[in-house]
Amino acid sequence: KQEAKSDIMPLSMCVAMSQGYIGYDLQNALKEELLDRGLQQGVATVLTQVVVDGNDPAFQHPTKPIGAFMSKEEAEKMAREKGWHIAEDAGRGWRQVVASPKPLAVVELTTIRALAEADNVVIACGGGGIPVIATDHHHLKGAAAVIDKDLASELLAEHLDADMLIILTAVEKVAVNFNKPNQKWLDALTPEEARTYIGEGQFAPGSMLPKVEAAVKFAESKPGRTALITLLEKARDGIDGKTGTRIAC
């Protein structure tokens, strides 16, 4: 929950640092591209905190792998000496696992909205947002957690009243029976169809599953909203309806 003092940097601070250096590179790359196209448009990175519930069950059942891969012996040593929760990660080795609680509110929402409405490109909720717990007197305390970036992005899009949520990933479309002889790419999904596939275990946890869950939540949050999941390089074609998987009611 709230982070204990130790010789290891608090996880919330690690997320904040990640937001800073990723935002720095992304902001400059976007600005350069805009200028190359003759566009005088502002680009801003907002250090973003996301509120979670300190009583979220995720804190009792950490599942999010972070950090370096270790041997079983190394992992067990860290568990004994540092109190880490550890787990094997898809046969690739052992890693620390931390809580991944549900995002509840974006603290800097008003600032992000103001920047966007002033025609700025806004980079926000990096790494899922800095996890914080609201205490008495409106204080915010860093939490030992990593928030799912897809769910955090959905929450932000929903509260900004966006028409479309675009989730860019490493494949052009969502598939069922992925990497099997009977694999099938999906052009469109209703929330009901998506839930059926989720129930069948069609989408891998930590990979496509949170993307589909975020897309379903956004599509159902307000009539007329659509979510798109596609490949980064195919974003334009996806927006134009030429590729990608669309999730809508």
PLM regions and their residue ranges:
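C-terminal catalytic "cap/lid" subdomain
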Residues: K1-C249
